[in-house]
């Protein structure tokens, strides 16, 4: 008998990608086939994003496409937390569930097309099904967030911080390493708050007792002999402890910290930490401890009430801090966000656009200057793409999809997933160019 086929669309952030991997793993264990095409599938699952208006539009467009090409559609994810928005336009979807509603998604699939599975056939590898390339994987350590940033509705969509016990996280990490993963990208909504909700619950691991705590997690992952990269780190004081592990080469000297802005006034309106002078002193301290440290961050321009003075303060902070990687978003009003009700003046779209271009130009200058310093150095690079003797990879300074790459020429064919030493010969605003040695 032919196994039922599920087509799957995963939208949004890496956290949503991990949710998709979990759902697909459950479906495969029950005998469902996963298809890349809507046509011919028994049902389509769309894992949506609902954070920004642009993301909501993309989610609705994907639902529309799935309905036209297939007709049987199950919707899950963040946009599913607001089912009326979906039902008003697409009343014929089979089911709508919110984020993290794994069991509800599986039940909806069972209703649409019951599973057929030979219990003697193992369909899922120990590490589960992954949607990333085989050599790297996202490791989600918690769900939700207990911060209340005024522009964000994540706590409404996904609830307060809920950490996974550290033994569960480490078991998953170990299985991934055993499956050949070379790099773990640690993610959550608030990575450095890991374990606070569990009051740093103690677990047994390898005949030892360890705490469900950010530092302990970094230390244990650092002993697994692979690249470990930290994302979505809120700048709590205890982050300082982890810099020592980076200096000791236990985990990658890379911190993804979403600073969002530099103006104290804007940061207070955002309900974010507003002591950027103190943050600058901490960055200086971090770089003294770990000179190889790379900082990545994201920023928002055009937040309601942002003045020219506020924006210029952001540009000055960029020039002073000289962070290696920075992304910038033009503010979009998010339905349900507190920022909508602050009574602040909205910034015209043309002003937002101008500020975004000025921000990006400033960061390109900084990045160009910093990358030139890599010329002549030899870097360890993990290969992401290969066309024989020409390849692309990433050094410790770059996360997949959001940062730059290293373009490589080689005398021998290079394989995806292998580490190569590369001598850097050129650079531009974002990327490096070199020869495998």
From Swiss-Prot:
Cofactor binding notes: Binds 2 [4Fe-4S] clusters. One cluster is coordinated with 3 cysteines and an exchangeable S-adenosyl-L-methionine.
Q: Where does [4Fe-4S] cluster 1 bind?
A: 13, 49, 78
For the protein in the UniProt heading, the enzyme class is: transferase
Q: Which residues bind [4Fe-4S] cluster 2?
A: 145, 149, 152
Q: Which InterPro entries is this protein grouped with?
A: Elp3/MiaA/NifB-like_rSAM, Methylthiotransferase, Methylthiotransferase_CS, Methylthiotransferase_N, Methylthiotransferase_N_sf, NA-bd_OB-fold, Ribosomal_uS12_MeSTrfase_RimO, rSAM
**Which residues does the UniProt record annotate as the domain TRAM?**
372-437
List cofactor names only. Answer: [4Fe-4S] cluster
Name any Gene Ontology BP term. Answer: tRNA modification
What range does the record give for the signal peptide? none
Write out the annotated subcellular location: Cytoplasm
NCBIfam families, sorted = 30S ribosomal protein S12 methylthiotransferase RimO, MiaB/RimO family radical SAM methylthiotransferase
| UniProt record similarity statement | Belongs to the methylthiotransferase family. RimO subfamily.
Name of the protein described by the UniProt record: Ribosomal protein uS12 methylthiotransferase RimO
Q: Which species?
A: Bartonella tribocorum (strain CIP 105476 / IBS 506)
